[in-house]
A protein has these predicted regions:
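Substrate-recognition "cap/lid" segment bordering the active-site pocket of phosphatases
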Residues: 93-146, 150-157
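Acidic, Mg2+-coordinating phosphoryl-transfer loop and its flanking beta/alpha structural elements
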Residues: 144-186
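Short, acidic loop-to-helix structural element flanking the phosphoryl-transfer center
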Residues: 56-87, 91-99
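Structural recognition of alpha->loop->beta junctions
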Residues: 105-116, 141, 177-197
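Residues at the starts of beta-strands that form the adenosine-phosphate
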Residues: 80, 84, 112, 163
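Active-site neighborhood of HAD-like aspartate-dependent phosphohydrolases
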Residues: 1-53
C-alpha cells in the first residue's frame, strides 16, 4: 500500500508549539483548543510584522517539536511491512534540513520527505528531487492519506478511491468532508486501525 502523511500536526505538535511561542513573543494567549484557523496569523490575530517574526523562529522551533504520540511507531510498522510512506509537507523548502533531521531523530530515516506548495508559499529550486511540482504530485497514487488541514483536501480530488484519515485538530472540526472516504481520527492507534492495521 501507499501512504501520504502530512508532517505538521500529524507527525508532530506544531500548533501547540506555535501557540506557546505566540504567547511568549506577543502575549497572544490563545488556548490550543481555541485555534479555529489553520492560518497562524488568523488564529493569533497577528499583524504582518508579528507573523513574519513568528515564522522567523521556525527553524529552531521545528527542531524541538514533540512527536504526536504513536506516529513514528505506526509509520515504521508500515515501512517494515513493505508499504511505501511519503511524508508530503506544505512547509517552505528552507526547512528541509531541520525537517529531515527531525524525522531521522525520531527513527523515520526510511520515510521519504517531499515538499508540495499546498498553500501558495512558493518553494523555489524546482529542480530539487524533494520538491514536487503539481504535475509530479498529481501523477502519484496513494491508498491512504493522513492530513489535518482542510485547505489540503483539494490535493486528493484526483484519487476517488483514496481513504483520507483526518487527524482531529481544532481547526478542522467544523470542516465538511468532500465525500464518504474521509474519516476523523483522534490518535495514531485509530489511524492504524482505520488503515486496516497493515502488516
Amino acid at each position: 500500500m501507499k501512504f501520504y502523511v502530512d508532517f505538521d500536526d500529524c507527525l508532530c505538535e506544531t500548533g501547540r508549539a506555535f501557540a506557546a511561542l505566540a504567547a511568549e513573543l506577543f502575549g497572544k494567549k490563545v488556548p490550543y483548543e481555541e485555534m479555529k484557523h489553520f492560518n497562524l496569523r488568523d488564529s493569533f490575530d497577528l499583524t504582518e510584522a508579528q507573523y513574519a517574526e513568528l515564522l522567523g523562529h521556525e527553524p529552531e522551533l521545528l527542531a524541538d517539536l514533540e512527536e504526536t504520540p504513536g506516529a513514528s511507531a505506526v509509520i515504521n510498522e508500515w515501512i517494515g511491512s513493505g508499504h511505501e510512506v511519503s511524508i508530503i509537507t506544505g512547509r517552505p523548502f528552507s526547512t528541509y534540513e531541520a525537517s529531515r533531521a527531525w524525522l531521522d531523530r525520531h527513527g523515520l530515516r526510511d520515510a521519504r520527505l517531499y515538499y508540495l506548495d499546498k498553500y501558495g508559499r512558493g518553494n523555489g529550486q524546482a529542480d530539487c528531487p524533494f520538491i514536487l511540482r503539481p504535475d509530479d504530485y498529481f501523477r502519484m497514487t496513494f491508498d491512504y492519506a493522513v492530513e489535518d488541514s482542510p485547505n489540503a483536501f483539494r490535493f486528493f480530488d484526483h484519487l476517488p478511491e483514496l481513504k483520507v484519515l483526518v487527524f482531529d485538530r481544532p481547526w478542522n472540526r467544523e470542516a465538511g468532508f468532500p465525500n464518504g472516504n474521509y474519516r476523523r481520527c483522534f490518535s495514531w492507534k485509530e489511524i492504524r486501525e482505520n488503515a486496516g492495521g497493515p502488516g
